[in-house]
Amino acid sequence: MRITDKQVAVLRAQLVGNREEHLRLADQLDPDEANVCYTALVAAAFIEAAEERFIRNGDAVDHSEVIDFVAQVRERADEMPDIIDPQIAESMILDLLGKGSMVDADPDTKFGHQIVLLAALVGEKQFTEDQLDAFLGNARALADELLQ
């Protein structure tokens, strides 16, 4: 399986905050696409965004910067403390950086955390359309690698 333009369009719509378009496009994905390919695309985009945000000059940032980021994400909306568990969110990032290990969580919980953290990371960058396209292209290439 490979990542399709349709799957990239679903993620793009979500990351630019176009909820209606995101839901419309997501409804068009077949369940296998959504469960395998789209999940891999989100994971790859999360990896790309987190590494860009939390690795500087080849070194991972301190734990405190990850903790501060997660706290800021949880403060952005009233419902965020109910959506984002700080222990899970921090462990996802720290595991990716090689500074900790992922706490036990079911796949749906991990995916939900990934997508919210990804949206926050992309939102911080304030990408132009061209920059977002380049970011999604990199994520797509990584996702294709993950699926092999």
Where are these regions (language model features)?
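Short N-terminal edge-element motif at the start of the domain
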Residues: 1-22
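Glycine-rich, aromatic-bearing surface loops/beta-hairpins
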Residues: 122-148
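Amphipathic protein-protein interaction modules
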Residues: 68-123
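N-terminal interaction modules that seed assembly of large macromolecular complexes
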Residues: 17-58
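Short, mixed-charge aromatic SLiMs
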Residues: 62-80, 138-148
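Long, hydrophobic, amphipathic alpha-helical segments used as structural scaffolds
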Residues: 50-61, 81, 104, 125-129, ...
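Alpha-helix N-cap/helix-initiation sites
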Residues: 35-40, 107-111, 129
